[in-house]
Swiss-Prot record:
Oligomer status and interactors: The complex is composed of six subunits: RnfA, RnfB, RnfC, RnfD, RnfE and RnfG.
Family listed: Belongs to the 4Fe4S bacterial-type ferredoxin family. RnfB subfamily.
Biological role: Part of a membrane-bound complex that couples electron transfer with translocation of ions across the membrane.
Natural source organism: Ectopseudomonas mendocina (strain ymp)
Protein name: Ion-translocating oxidoreductase complex subunit B
PROSITE patterns assigned: 4FE4S, 4FE4S_FER_1, 4FE4S_FER_2
Lineage of the species this protein comes from: Bacteria, Pseudomonadati, Pseudomonadota, Gammaproteobacteria, Pseudomonadales
InterPro entries named in the record: 4Fe-4S_dom, 4Fe4S_Fe-S-bd, 4Fe4S_Fe_S_CS, Elect_transpt_cplx_RnfB/RsxB, RnfB/RsxB_Proteobac, RnfB_subfamily
Region (Hydrophobic): 1-26
Binding-site positions, [4Fe-4S] cluster 3: C124, C144, C147, C150
Highest taxon, organism lineage: Bacteria
Biological processes, Gene Ontology terms: electron transport chain
Residues noted as binding [4Fe-4S] cluster 1 in the record, renumbered to the chain: C49, C52, C57, C73
Compartments, record wording: Cell inner membrane
Cofactor or coenzyme needed: [4Fe-4S] cluster
Amino acid sequence: MSLVLVAVLALLGLCLIAGAILGFAAVRFKVEGDPIAEQINALLPQTQCGQCGYPGCKPYAEAIAGGDKINKCPPGGEATIQALADLLDVEPEPLDAVEGEKPQMVAFIREAECIGCTKCIQACPVDAIVGAARQMHTVIVSECTGCDLCVEPCPVDCIDMIEVGSTVQSWKWDKPLAPGQLIASDREQAA
């Protein structure tokens, strides 16, 4: 019985020593991150499309945390701008004119011309293109962000970016103003 007790105590001692070493290492080698950049990154759409002028969502989040504008993300749109404005306690701005509001585009692969090289699949940051090697590829329209990153690597130039037309699901209209918010000229036009 005493041999078992010695073994248990030896293991307990080793565990305590290893725990102390790990605890010291965790405190000593702690990596400091910017918590606000992580919160901003969580709000971005994670398409990694580069339409904002940065190579991905995390660098853009770090730039926003450093003071860059919050209105450069077309895939996120107005909802992301509003969420970022609420988080950072700043006024929301309309999408930037350079990177900003463009017609919604989606990739279209002319399947008869596709040679199945898979270069577009590798370039797509959101995995919106499906297909196999030496087989035709197609785009999952609901997943495509219109980032245009799949067009350039295509060796046979069979990918086009086409504008998504307005549908019942995507159609938007201006919200009417409350009567107290109308100015005199608006009231005259409404009458």
